[in-house]
Amino acid sequence: MATFVSELEAAKKNLSEALGDNVKQYWANLKLWFKQKISKEEFDLEAHRLLTQDNVHSHNDFLLAILTRCQILVSTPDGAGSLPWPGGSAAKPGKPKGKKKLSSVRQKFDHRFQPQNPLSGAQQFVAKDPQDDDDLKLCSHTMMLPTRGQLEGRMIVTAYEHGLDNVTEEAVSAVVYAVENHLKDILTSVVSRRKAYRLRDGHFKYAFGSNVTPQPYLKNSVVAYNNLIESPPAFTAPCAGQNPASHPPPDDAEQQAALLLACSGDTLPASLPPVNMYDLFEALQVHREVIPTHTVYALNIERIITKLWHPNHEELQQDKVHRQRLAAKEGLLLC
């Protein structure tokens, strides 16, 4: 692993020296490529514009070092993922070998003013294959947590933007745990709005969706729930072989459960439908501390509202008429 880190730092240093003042623009383009805002071809074209012809190889070496560091196996066809670099070819392409033929002035004039197609130098448009969407590694597409290699790649780019040289394994592990705990906090806020729960130590929520509900007309029920033994008593000097964090005795726990069941109501709570976007929207509005950053909070609220939108009958009818017109142009008939 140390070898890969040294290779990455050496490749980054060589690339920074080759870029010079254009290093900030290169990191910005690299970030856009990681976010799937631009394609690999567009990123290579921008790198080719920022680098000289003799320093293009530093761009390829840097990308190869990142992929090796993140342990991502990428299989690309030959010549599709790298920029051309004419290493030691001193001869100019296109010049035929042999003696030059003398041409008249008229031939030179006609050759110079031949009409050209202005679209010949434009970039060729390539239709995107729907199967290429499988290459996207965003959480919103895969519906899964990002892998350790993906997080490390994003962290390396962010570190370079802030002037850092490397990302340690401990930092990657901390981000992985932070993502998991952040999602658990969001799920806890959603479930706590739908189901009853109990509190331990005044802040820890547990026992979600318990079927035992207190009877509000019985005075015993309030006392039973308030005097609930949630944690074992703290021993100042535990005896030898005694675990201070042990659970209450089985007889006490059974007696406590029987008392709660006797003080509960006769009817069970109604079953709820699965969690939907409305529950998430309400939970984030009530528990705003779950997402403390205002920018991230506002962006996710907008995305939730967009998901909740659905077309009305007039828009559905207009869409149907539009599809029928398109089908009529193509010679098809929609039922």
Curated annotation (Swiss-Prot):
Keywords: Nucleus, Transcription, Transcription regulation
Entry superkingdom: Eukaryota
Coiled coil (residue ranges): none
Pfam families: SAGA-Tad1
Subcellular location: Nucleus
Any GO BP annotation: regulation of RNA splicing
CDD domains: HFD_TADA1
Bias type Basic residues, positions: 94-103
Renumbered residue ranges of the record's region Disordered: 83-103
Gene Ontology cellular component terms for the protein in this record: cytosol; focal adhesion; nucleoplasm; nucleus; SAGA complex
One GO MF term attached to the UniProt entry: transcription coactivator activity
Keyword Nucleus: yes
Subunit structure as annotated in this protein's UniProt entry: Component of the STAGA transcription coactivator-HAT complex, at least composed of SUPT3H, GCN5L2, TAF5L, TAF6L, SUPT7L, TADA3L, TAD1L, TAF10, TAF12, TRRAP and TAF9.
Cited function: Probably involved in transcriptional regulation.
Family designation: Belongs to the TADA1 family.
Protein name: Transcriptional adapter 1
Organism (species): Homo sapiens (Human)
Designated gene of the protein: TADA1
